[in-house]
């Protein structure tokens, strides 16, 4: 979606907030929810985000094992989230809310090279340079139980 279409959504009263973010090392979408006006005013420069998203686990416990990029010694510096407008889309289950995936940059204008989106993009480029077209699919695994959360917990199931 281009910025004029986003402005149109705002003008029509169909967009109040935008969820901006990027996947962390576990693939969890991390970011923030901003007012649509703030999104428009700031999307070109990007949005500050703490680099701790590369320094914690899926439960948000800060890792202390000598991480080079994100750590206490560096003070968990800010990185910049720059929205990829090609990923901008309304969130169907939330009224007047859209989402936009961001690419991550350092404050010095360099790619955050450990960002999963950057790593994937680099691998796609390398594969294409070798004459391959990468393809991927998701496999969802789930189980059905004749139980509920309480009965499962009582039986000490996972």
What are these regions (language model features)?
Residues 1-158:
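ATP/Mg2+-dependent ligation/transfer catalytic cores
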């Amino acid at each position: 979606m281009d910025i004029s279409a986003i402005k149109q959504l705002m003008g029509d009263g169909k967009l109040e907030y935008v969820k901006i973010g990027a996947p962390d090392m576990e693939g969890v979408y991390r970011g923030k929810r901003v007012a649509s006006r703030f999104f428009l005013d700031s999307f070109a420069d990007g949005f500050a985000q703490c680099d701790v998203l590369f320094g914690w686990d899926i439960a948000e416990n800060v890792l202390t094992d000598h991480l080079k990029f994100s750590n206490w010694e560096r003070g968990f510096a800010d990185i910049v989230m720059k929205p990829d407008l090609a990923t901008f889309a309304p969130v169907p289950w939330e009224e007047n809310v859209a989402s936009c995936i961001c690419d991550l940059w350092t404050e010095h204008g360099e790619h955050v090279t450990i960002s999963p989106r950057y790593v994937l993009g680099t691998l796609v480029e390398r594969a294409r340079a070798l004459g391959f077209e990468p393809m991927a699919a998701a496999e969802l695994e789930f189980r059905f139980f004749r139980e509920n959360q309480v009965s499962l917990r009582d039986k000490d199931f996972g």
